[in-house]
Amino acid sequence: MKQDIHPDYHFITVTLTDGSSYKTRSTYGKEGANLALDIDPRTHPAWTGGNAQLMDRGGRVSRFNAKFAGFTGKKA
């Protein structure tokens, strides 16, 4: 097995949207880093069965909707 080719695997803290947190091992950041989640299993519409709108991060959803507003997908 090759030596020194794998990323550092260390403990980080993951903070959920409700403020609760847990420790896990990851290659994210450095030892003791905090990963704050925007969406987690408790708030994601796919797992909660809700019809919540997608969060528009940086206008991406708005740009997509504007670009494809007239597209119906039907062949003429």
UniProtKB/Swiss-Prot annotation:
GO terms for biological process: translation. Transmembrane segments: none annotated. GO terms for cellular component: ribonucleoprotein complex; ribosome. The gene is rpmE. PANTHER family: 50S RIBOSOMAL PROTEIN L31, CHLOROPLASTIC, LARGE RIBOSOMAL SUBUNIT PROTEIN BL31A. InterPro entries: Ribosomal_bL28/bL31-like_sf (IPR034704), Ribosomal_bL31 (IPR002150), Ribosomal_bL31_A (IPR027491), Ribosomal_bL31_sf (IPR042105). SUPFAM superfamilies: L28p-like. The lineage of its organism: Bacteria, Pseudomonadati, Pseudomonadota, Alphaproteobacteria, Caulobacterales. NCBIfam families: L31, PRK00528.1. Part of the 50S ribosomal subunit. This is Large ribosomal subunit protein bL31. Binds the 23S rRNA. Belongs to the bacterial ribosomal protein bL31 family. Type A subfamily. One of its GO terms (molecular function) is rRNA binding. Keywords: Ribonucleoprotein, Ribosomal protein, RNA-binding, rRNA-binding. Pfam families: Ribosomal_L31.
